[in-house]
Amino acid sequence: TLTLEDVEVAEHKDINDEGQTIHIPAAQTTATDDSSKINVSEAKKEVSVTDTVAYRNLVPGKTYTISGTLMDQRTGKAVTVNGKAVTSSADFTPDTADGETTVDFHFNTNGLDDTTVVVFEKMFYGKAEIAAHEDINDKGQTIYIPSVKTTAIDDKTATKLTLAEKDI
């Protein structure tokens, strides 16, 4: 609306006018271990986690970047391996305003037993951050790395000690 001395002199209201439309991008993510196909990874091994990013309201044909960081849910800090934060990024050019893309993380879980890892994602157009999904409590972004321990007990002694018999 254009006014002159408090009098409306022009108006332009067109819900379908692309020139008047502001696109507000959004992203939602789901993390899955490539081996288990669920949100649980094995401890003490190299793992691959795929974070599927569902995006909305992007401009088709433009190139975007998704950057992700693995976070320790307990500490709220980045997960580190050999002193470096575990991060990954991927560029993509959508064909449609709404869709999905993936970001792959490859890392060693040695020393991460009993850790809950949460994937934080940011979306960029050029250097401008246009969307983020960083919820430390989001189960969809969460990968569990369990701690597994075993204890052997002798049937006869009911302890960790066994009798010096021929048949054990």
PLM region descriptions:
Residues 1-168:
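Solvent-exposed loop/turn and edge beta-strand elements of beta-rich ligand-binding domains
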